[in-house]
Curated annotation (Swiss-Prot):
PROSITE patterns: RIBOSOMAL_L23 (PS00050). Keywords: Ribonucleoprotein, Ribosomal protein, RNA-binding, rRNA-binding. GO terms for molecular function: rRNA binding; structural constituent of ribosome. One of its GO terms (biological process) is translation. SUPFAM superfamilies: Ribosomal proteins S24e, L23 and L15e. Disulfide bonds: none annotated. Gene3D superfamilies: 3.30.70.330. This is Large ribosomal subunit protein uL23. NCBIfam families: PRK05738.2-4. GO terms for cellular component: ribonucleoprotein complex; ribosome. It comes from Lactobacillus johnsonii (strain CNCM I-12250 / La1 / NCC 533).
Length: 98
């Protein structure tokens, strides 16, 4: 499996943006991905050294359309911590609004 198939997209929330200051980056990953696969994929794609990987499963939410109920797809998030001597991941511009 290719590394770009494992990492789906970065998670862009206020909390994940604040974690970037501590060299922690949040990504949506494949539901079947393991910590080792996520670590290897991040190191290959971004050319950084990974210190730790934390993974959490997010359940799908119930949604209604009229009288019909359904669920959104479940997903898996990975919070990747980089080593102190590693480079930052350049996902966005360095412009920060104050």
């Amino acid at each position: 499996m290719d590394a770009r198939d494992i990492i789906l997209r970065p998670v862009v929330t206020e909390k994940s943006m604040n974690l970037m200051d501590d060299k922690k980056y949040t990504f949506d990953v494949l539901v079947s991905a393991t910590k080792t696969q996520v670590r290897n994929a991040i190191e290959e794609i971004f050319d950084v050294k990974v210190k730790n990987v934390n993974i959490m499963n997010v359940r799908g939410k119930e949604k209604r359309v009229g009288r019909y109920t359904g669920k959104t797809a479940r997903r898996r998030k990975a919070i990747v911590t980089l080593t102190e001597d590693s480079n930052d991941i350049k996902i966005f511009n360095d412009n920060k609004e104050n």
